[in-house]
């Protein structure tokens, strides 16, 4: 059983059902692997192995008594901005370094009820602000494909843990590309659902109108297994939409993959996604993937979308503005980090926030506060909201010509740790992904090749509520290619 970490969720569920191994053996295998190798990756902030092993034993007992939940006893892990009762929830920040949540996020509760066993909490950029996972108070995460390189962010710990074979699937959150970009950098699959599809209750907020929880897995099918229990209406979340979700797993398993399975499907490609800044090797992999989609029956059509430079500017006005508001609650009084021996209330506020927040979070709070200030609110924030509406309209027009839009996920492969210290350069990594968040659309990234030995991801974007279409389309591609099965040296 030395290669259990190579198995898909589907294979793990079958193995448990057929008694090829127990949940306890499975959790023990992954825990031992994490203890042995995560020193090189730093993907976990909190290892909750004792509780996981207890849950695995319970899962085995329940299965023996006839509990037939297919995912009962399958391991996974959570991004550390999802509240977990009795377990540290830090959001990668000194501000919450010792915060133990008194309740579970709805997502955490739903996943546990489906039978999954959580192994712990995964590293992330502080308060989900970053694209490389170098801003975490708990140290940078390393990419399993090259431990000298970044895994992407902000869900870098989640992506790295799946790519390293520490867990078969993991949760993440995506505000401007924080699932899709690390999925691309780490050579795995990741999906951001439609805004409102998955509950945000219990997810520590960065930008409330943009944040959405999603999943990582080796394949589209693995992502579907974890997304299925997460999706659905939650009355505790005011942004949750009361709309039935599809049976993602059943839809994929019923999909025909032989012949020309994508016949009749139109995939839109915009010239704006292939401009300056796109690495030539990345573009080569993307073009090859699009040709494969054509071979599978899809028709490639040209569409127009908002200039990515405009979406980038819009996002970096709106997201920091919302962050400025959301993070004002961390004042050293109610919860979170509190400075020592404050001279007065003003000193308590000032020092607690300046000592508790890292440089990138402080930068975005300042940017957001400036955009919201009385003299600039209309010139910046209000105008950005109007542009956001136009971005939504442009996507609607594009989808009149196609079923799915394809683009590179990131303009480059993973870069070296510490290499891109200029914040503006890091912000540019989100250039292809942020428009999706501004429009509230679902999108997925799946691996389609390599650039200089590093993974490259293709982004697929669909209409609102069409997660199943995305997953089925990626599954068809993955049924005819093996890029999603490529393994980093750490995993072989």
Swiss-Prot record:
The keyword Ligase applies. GO terms for cellular component: glutamyl-tRNA(Gln) amidotransferase complex. Keywords: ATP-binding, Ligase, Nucleotide-binding, Protein biosynthesis. The keyword Amino-acid biosynthesis does not apply. It catalyses: L-glutamyl-tRNA(Gln) + L-glutamine + ATP + H2O = L-glutaminyl-tRNA(Gln) + L-glutamate + ADP + phosphate + H(+). GO terms for biological process: translation. One of its GO terms (molecular function) is ATP binding. The active site is at 79 (charge relay system), 154 (charge relay system), 178 (acyl-ester intermediate). Pfam families: Amidase. InterPro entries: Amidase, Amidase_CS, Amidase_dom, AS_sf, GatA. Its EC number is 6.3.5.7. It is an enzyme of class 6 (ligase). It comes from the Bacteria. PANTHER family: GLUTAMYL-TRNA(GLN) AMIDOTRANSFERASE SUBUNIT A, TRANSAMIDASE. NCBIfam families: gatA. Heterotrimer of A, B and C subunits. Belongs to the amidase family. GatA subfamily. Allows the formation of correctly charged Gln-tRNA(Gln) through the transamidation of misacylated Glu-tRNA(Gln) in organisms which lack glutaminyl-tRNA synthetase. The reaction takes place in the presence of glutamine and ATP through an activated gamma-phospho-Glu-tRNA(Gln). This is Glutamyl-tRNA(Gln) amidotransferase subunit A.
């Amino acid at each position: 059983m030395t290669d259990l970490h190579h198995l898909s969720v589907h294979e793990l569920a079958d193995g448990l059902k057929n008694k090829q191994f127990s949940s306890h053996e499975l959790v023990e295998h992954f825990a031992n692997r994490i203890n042995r190798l995560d020193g090189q990756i730093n993907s976990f902030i909190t290892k909750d192995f004792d509780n996981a092993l207890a849950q695995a034993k319970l899962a085995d007992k329940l299965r023996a008594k006839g509990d037939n939940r297919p995912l009962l006893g399958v391991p996974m892990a959570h991004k550390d901005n999802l509240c977990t009762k009795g377990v540290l929830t830090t959001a990668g920040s000194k501000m919450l370094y010792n915060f133990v949540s008194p309740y579970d996020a709805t997502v955490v509760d739903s996943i546990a009820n489906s039978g999954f066993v959580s192994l712990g909490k995964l590293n992330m950029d502080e308060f989900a602000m970053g694209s490389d996972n170098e801003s975490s108070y708990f140290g940078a995460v390393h990419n399993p494909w090259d431990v000298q390189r970044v895994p992407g962010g902000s869900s870098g710990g989640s992506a790295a843990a799946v790519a390293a074979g520490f867990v078969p699937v993991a949760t993440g959150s995506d505000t401007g590309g924080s699932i899709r970009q690390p999925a691309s950098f780490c050579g795995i699959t990741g999906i951001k659902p439609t805004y409102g599809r998955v509950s945000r209750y219990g997810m520590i907020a960065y930008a409330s109108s943009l944040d959405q929880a999603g999943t990582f897995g080796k394949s589209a099918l693995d992502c579907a297994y974890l997304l299925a229990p997460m999706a659905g209406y939650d009355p505790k979340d005011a942004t949750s939409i009361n709309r039935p979700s599809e049976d993602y797993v059943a839809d994929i398993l019923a999909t025909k993959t032989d012949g020309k399975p994508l016949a009749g499907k139109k995939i839109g490609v915009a010239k704006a996604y292939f401009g300056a800044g796109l690495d030539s090797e990345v573009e080569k992999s993307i073009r090859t993937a699009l040709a494969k989609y054509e071979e599978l029956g899809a028709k490639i059509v040209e569409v127009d979308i908002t200039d990515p430079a405009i979406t980038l500017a819009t996002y970096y006005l709106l997201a920091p503005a919302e962050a400025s508001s959301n993070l004002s609650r961390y004042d050293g009084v109610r919860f979170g980090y509190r400075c020592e021996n404050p001279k007065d209330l003003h000193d308590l506020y000032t020092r607690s926030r300046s000592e508790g927040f890292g440089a990138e979070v402080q930068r975005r709070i300042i940017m957001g506060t400036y955009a919201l200030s009385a003299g600039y609110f209309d010139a910046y924030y209000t105008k950005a909201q109007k542009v956001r509406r136009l971005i939504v309209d442009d996507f609607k027009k594009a989808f009149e010509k196609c079923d799915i839009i394809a683009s590179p996920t990131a303009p480059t492969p993973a870069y070296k740790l510490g290499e891109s210290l200029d914040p503006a350069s890091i912000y540019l990594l989100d250039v292809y992904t942020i428009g999706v968040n501004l429009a509230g659309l679902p999108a997925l990234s799946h691996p389609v090749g390599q650039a200089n030995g590093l993974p490259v991801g293709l982004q697929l974007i669909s209409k609102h509520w069409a997660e199943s279409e995305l997953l089925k389309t990626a599954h068809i591609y993955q049924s005819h290619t093996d890029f999603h099965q490529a393994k980093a040296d750490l995993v072989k």
